[in-house]
Amino acid sequence: MGQKIHPTGFRLSISRNWASRWYANDRDFAGMLAEDIKVREYLKAKLKNASVSRVLIERPAKNARITIFSARPGVVIGKKGEDIENLKRELSRQLGVPVAVNIEEVRKPEIDAKLIADSITQQLEKRIMFRRAMKRAMQNAMRLGALGIKIMSSGRLNGIEIARCEWYREGRVPLHTLRADIDYGTSEAQTTYGIIGVKVWVYKGDTLGRNDLPAAVEARTDEERRPRGPRRDDRGARPGADRPAPRVARRPPMGANTAPSDGSDKPAEATGAGAPKPAVQRVRKVAAPAAAADGKGE
């Protein structure tokens, strides 16, 4: 059931990492997890126009470090860093510990699944045709290096009475391959007809480990290669070194005189016990005239 499972949860600890990285005992785990959910909801509402892809929350000893991945870091920082300072104070008040906020820029927002889904939902809320929005997003993703993309929209598309689901795919999106780097994102559009959900899968290629590929091994040049010496066995000599070279019988060239020296009319190749026998020719006998057979002609 590769279509049903969550691509990120399926690849955790293989090619994906957790969005919240901290340890807690059984008593504090639920409370800290609820705090993370509230922080993400707050940042989603606060930075709605900043194109936020994901939020990474880390909790070192009695501190918190929040990394915001955004395609528009200038909107998050604000004029002279005022917005980010206000953000730090609000997050520290919610978590109750000192908070450090880092901003990471998303270089290619066109191939980020979350940003693609948010872009489509914004267009749907502006009453743009969903097929046009989906196909435009797919073209931009394939143009910027994605190997495959799949977009699915569900709900009352174009305001119809019965909700349905439509999806489009371009390229290949291997959902069962664990080493495949599949970026998955969802978003919801609040329309006058109801909620329209958008899911996006983006295939960016294969990866090993947590986005760590082994270094390519360069081939050595001829000058760097060491000359290979003779291989020796237990007796100290190369096996087969004292073996004489095989003798190859040479055949006479085509058109040469191959007549035998004894004067026979057969060629030298045809003489001997193994020579093929000549084919037997059948001669048709001509019958004598009847008069000559009876003796009446004399």
UniProtKB/Swiss-Prot annotation:
Q: Check the record and name the SMART domains matching this protein.
A: KH
**Which GO biological process annotations does it have?**
translation
Which Pfam families does the entry mention?
KH_2, Ribosomal_S3_C
Which intervals carry biased composition (Basic and acidic residues)?
219-245
- Cite the GO molecular-function annotations of the record: mRNA binding; rRNA binding; structural constituent of ribosome
Positions with biased composition (Low complexity): 277-298
- Name-wise, this protein is Small ribosomal subunit protein uS3
